[in-house]
Amino acid sequence: MSALHAFPGGLCLPANKERSTALPIQQAPLAQRYIVPLGQHIGAPARPCVEVGQAVLKGQTIALPDGTVSAALHAPTSGTVVAIGAHPYPHASGLPAPAIVIASDGLERWTELHPCPDFRAESPLALLERIRAAGIGGLGGAGFPTAAKLAARPAEKIHTLVVNGAECEPYISADDLLMRERATQVLGGIDILVQILCPEEVLVGIEDDKPEAIAALGAALGERPYRIVALPTRYPSGGERQLIQLLTGREVPADGLPADIGILCQNVGTLAAVHDAVVLGRPLISRITTLAGGALERPMNVEALIGTPVHELLAFAGLAEGRLERVLMGGPMMGFALPDLSVPLIKTCNCLLAGDATELPEPVPAMPCIRCGDCAQVCPVSLLPQQLHFFALGDEHEQLLAHNLFDCIECGACAYVCPSSIPLVQYYRASKAEIREQRQKLLKAEQSRERFEQRQARLRRDEERRAAERAQRAEKAALARAAQAEREEAAPATAVDPVQAAIERARARKQAGSGSERLKRLKIEASMARVALKKAEKQLLSHDTPEQHGLVAELRAAAEAADKALADAEASLPRDLPSAPPAALDDEAELKKAKAQAAMARAQLKRSEKAFGEAPGAEQRATLDELRAEVERCEATLARLERHAPKPAAPGDDGQAALKRAKIALVGKRAALKKAEQAGVMDSELERLRGELQAAERDLHAAEDACGKPAPELVRIDKRPVDPRIRELKTELAYARAALKKLERLANADAAALAAARARLSAAERALTEHGTE
């Protein structure tokens, strides 16, 4: 590089750094409490890994990074965690933020450190992990996690490392004192980054109003091939993009990063922290901060622990509250006013400016823009601040984006020269926040739309799958019906004429019609009489009068007469009707109906017995008697129909098939009887099932005789009895195995318990083996 380049715009501002650089770096006194916010960096806040009441050591990790773009936090001193929750936070919004509060014990006991003096023997990934574990973020003000910034994408070859020592904003002199007094640490940090990035060139940019810092770095440089470049004092030459343009003449793309053009920029304070983290093993728990302003008796640069309350630092510098106008965190151009002095010092705080009324006067009321163009002349990124102002007033977000609002670095140069005293930067910040919020809403809406479309597609696929399955089942059913039809057509015709059989069944139904109709009418009359009797008995419970007793007696006599008439009619029916079965068993419908009625009657009786309990009342007993009588009638009807039911015989059936069916029928009858005995059904039902079982046994014997198959030869085999000792040993072995498996599944199982369980299993196996060999 033969000559310096220039960036557009900029200002020449009074430095006001003489008072704060008059003293060397001071050490802040130990505070009683330290407030460590979880979000001191760009990206996701850290996750606490300590609990309230837990004792911590100095340098101990108290919060872990939550993701790639995040940074760990460490205890600034030894003590006890007394709170984890919301606390005032140094931010322009004034909103509280979660923090970890540590009460100091005053002992300053360090945790175990892991230094690495010979860092050149380490791999770049190992060095990056050390930087990440130390919780280092950019100390120049942005606070971007350093490890994430250094872990560039593989396609990005960094050829130039730019070291930012410009420190162009008035009052701030923290980097100046750091380079003067700790140049070796700064250069050591550069060496570590060179080990990681392997750049072709290292450029150190320092403004020419810091001759002591330039001399100190030059003296410590030695044989290193780094170039120290003196920059003209012009605000904001310390901006990342402006410094790169000054040193290299290249501009960073509007929507890009310096790494996109092969350049990486780091602040000198960050480099010193990298040196301490790698070489000394110390995490980032302190930083150098400038204490300046007319309200301080002793302006200075102080090395303070992260989390120190601001009011304690200002008191250490001799704060004169009578002269204090307000306190800014940062410089007069880019800083913001602190609403509460109890906020803590954070990693990105490079200056606390306690200004008096002369330095920080009350802002005058803003006047309308006169379109003078001064703001456009001083803008370091060649924007049109007056146009952005008008677009911000009208919430014209598209125009703001078209005019590159997000290229604004919020340096404050436009507001500084504005003759109308318009707070332009505040308008830009508000518009940026609105656009970010709108983008977040659009992103959420897009994500919701995608999820909805995915759900609709999933439902559509499920419906298509179900439709395909239904079509497949319908096709299979159609094929089965077609095959059945073909088999029926191919089957030989039976000897019985179906037309003649239908005529015979119709004639039988006509002959038995009169008796059936009379029996049906008698059943209805008997049922109505019982219902009337039951209703009268219920009324008798609440109206115990002679008239009611007489009515109940009359209804009981009528019900008994109806039951007797029904019983006589059923008894008068012929038991064996040669021509009736075909009519009564038309396609087995009557038999199925009788079975269903019998099952319903038995179920109703069982439910009533369960509901009435062990000691039913008089009315309940009467109901149970009626239900039992109904069950007996249904079973008698079913038995009569089953006697006349023809035995189904398959065409061409031989003796073996009949024997197989008889065996299956016998197994079914046995299962039904066993199930009924376990369910505790009525004795009459059990007798019926036993009779069916005996009939099935007789059918089986007849089938065996008919098939001509010889009876199997029975051979008695003596079964050796089981040794009780073997049974006992096998049981012990099973328990030992189960206990060991249960302990092995536990993640925190005791080693002694595991050893005891294994010993028990070995003993059980050995005992079983020894007994088997006896």
Curated annotation (Swiss-Prot):
[4Fe-4S] cluster 1 binds at C369, C372, C375, C418. Its cofactor is [4Fe-4S] cluster. Residues 359-389, 399-428 form the 4Fe-4S ferredoxin-type domain. It is found in: Cell inner membrane. This is Ion-translocating oxidoreductase complex subunit C. GO terms for molecular function: 4 iron, 4 sulfur cluster binding; electron transfer activity; metal ion binding. Part of a membrane-bound complex that couples electron transfer with translocation of ions across the membrane. Residues 453-490 have a biased composition (Basic and acidic residues). The complex is composed of six subunits: RnfA, RnfB, RnfC, RnfD, RnfE and RnfG. InterPro entries: 4Fe4S_Fe-S-bd, 4Fe4S_Fe_S_CS, Ion_transpt_RnfC/RsxC, Nuo51_FMN-bd, Nuo51_FMN-bd_sf, RnfC_N, Soluble_ligand-bd. One of its GO terms (cellular component) is plasma membrane. One of its GO terms (biological process) is electron transport chain. It is an enzyme of class 7 (translocase). It comes from the Bacteria. Binds 2 [4Fe-4S] clusters per subunit. PANTHER family: ION-TRANSLOCATING OXIDOREDUCTASE COMPLEX SUBUNIT C. Belongs to the 4Fe4S bacterial-type ferredoxin family. RnfC subfamily. The gene is rnfC. It is a peripheral membrane protein. Keywords: 4Fe-4S, Cell inner membrane, Cell membrane, Electron transport, Iron, Iron-sulfur, Membrane, Metal-binding, Repeat, Translocase, Transport. Residues 453-493 are annotated as: Disordered.
